[in-house]
C-alpha cells in the first residue's frame, strides 16, 4: 500500500491506495486493515482522517466489510437530522436531500451525550458534477480558538440549537 496526501501542505486526510491492481480488491484491503489495525489507529489519531482511494469497493456490503475490518463494534442507531436510507445493517446514505441542498460543515451528531468515535464515508455513485465531502480537523479549530473562549466552552458547555428550513424552501432568507 502507498500513502500520500492530497496536497503538500495539508495532511488531512492521509490517503492510502493499492500499489498495483492485485492490491486493490476488497478482500486484500480487508486483510490489510486487519493486519495493520494498530498502525492505522495511530495514523488516524495523527492525521484525523484516512481516505482509502482506488479500491474495488462496489456495494454497500463491500463497504460494510471494510468498516467492520477497522472497527468490529459498529453502531447503527442514527439520531441525526438529515433523512437517510438504510443500505445494510451498518451502512446508510449520507443524505436523501436534493443535490442543490448544501450540507454545511459540522461535527457529526455532536449534540449527543456521546458522539460517534468514528465515521466511515463511501462514494457508491460518483456525481456527474459537483459532489463533495468536506472534512475539517476540528482539533485545529479548537486549538485556534481564543483560550478565553475555549475556557468558557469547557466550563459552561455548549447548547445546540438547530434551525433548518425544509429542502423545498428555496428562500435564501429562511433561517
Task: List the predicted regions and their residue ranges.
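Non-heme Fe(II) oxygenase catalytic core, chiefly the N-lobe of the double-stranded beta-helix
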Residues: 1-175
Amino acid at each position: 500500500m502507498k500513502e500520500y496526501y492530497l496536497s503538500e501542505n495539508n495532511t488531512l486526510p492521509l490517503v492510502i491506495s493499492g500499489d498495483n491492481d492485485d492490491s486493490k480488491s476488497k478482500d486484500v484491503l480487508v486483510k490489510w486493515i486487519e493486519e495493520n489495525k494498530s498502525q492505522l489507529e495511530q495514523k488516524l489519531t495523527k492525521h484525523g482522517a484516512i481516505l482509502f482511494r482506488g479500491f474495488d469497493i462496489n456495494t454497500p456490503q463491500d463497504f460494510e466489510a471494510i468498516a467492520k475490518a477497522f472497527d468490529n463494534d459498529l453502531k447503527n442507531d442514527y439520531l441525526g437530522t438529515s433523512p437517510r436510507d438504510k443500505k445494510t445493517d451498518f451502512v446508510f446514505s449520507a443524505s436523501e436531500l436534493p443535490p442543490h441542498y448544501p450540507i454545511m460543515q459540522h461535527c457529526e451528531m455532536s449534540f449527543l451525550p456521546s458522539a460517534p468515535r468514528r465515521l466511515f464515508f463511501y462514494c457508491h455513485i460518483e456525481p456527474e458534477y459537483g459532489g463533495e465531502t468536506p472534512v475539517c480537523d476540528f482539533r485545529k479549530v479548537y486549538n485556534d480558538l481564543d483560550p478565553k473562549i475555549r475556557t468558557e466552552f469547557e466550563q459552561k458547555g455548549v447548547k445546540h440549537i438547530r434551525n433548518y428550513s425544509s429542502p423545498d424552501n428555496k428562500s435564501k432568507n429562511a433561517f
